Amino acid sequence: MHTVFPKEELNQRLLNVRSQMAHANVDGIVITVPENIYYLTELDHLGFFACHLLVVPKEGEMILVCRAMEKITFENQVKNARFFGHADNEDPADYIVSALSELKLLNSRVGIEKNSLFLTAKLAESIQAKTPKVEWQDTSNLVSALRIVKSPLEMDYVRKAAKATDAGMLAAINSIHDGASDYEVSAECSRAMISAGSEHFAFGPFIRPTSRLGEEHTTWRGEVFKKGDAIF
């Protein structure tokens, strides 16, 4: 089983979330932010670009709604929630309704993370239309606020991530010279970070010559560094 944090830490996180749910006076919440889903379940993969919604009741087992093809990943990684998998030609909202029904939340006050890049307007409208008796509340910051305070084990991982980042930065700096391509530099940066224990990168790396210095979010393009270049 893939695991980073012990069961006790995950249990404490869930207790903290439920405490905040009580303060918000909601009977359940629907989590749509991938980082928040990971925070409670440890589901760690790249399928989060598609629908992922975690239903958290005030008591009882959580339910994750996502694509059916993610079942094996879910079973390998998640031990504290149930899996409701939908086919790609089905409306995920129907599975959210089933999850809410299973957890007896169809006549309740339920929070949802509205301020999420991963909840489309179409899906939100479909969920709302199919749950006329649910009183929906915006709980966008409920879980995110708890994540700000790190546990000792989380801090250890932050330090490990910083060391991997340092390794990548130093490798990039050392590989830059007149005539080097940003392909070479980016490859050395990535190699060093992965060798230092990094998993897949959340962003970047961003390595740019003078000609693209002001482009905030562009990566390597096959350009060649020249003597005197300012480099990001």
Q: What role is predicted for each listed range?
A:
Residues 27, 108, 229:
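Conserved acidic residues
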Residues 37-48, 140-145, 149, 180-232:
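Short catalytic-site patches enriched in acidic/histidine residues
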Residues 1-98, 163, 167, 221-223:
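N-terminal accessory/capping or targeting/presequence segment of soluble
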Residues 64, 83, 136, 206-207:
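Generic preference for hydrophobic
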Residues 34, 114-116, 210-212:
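Acidic, glycine-rich active-site loops and adjacent beta-strand->loop/helix elements
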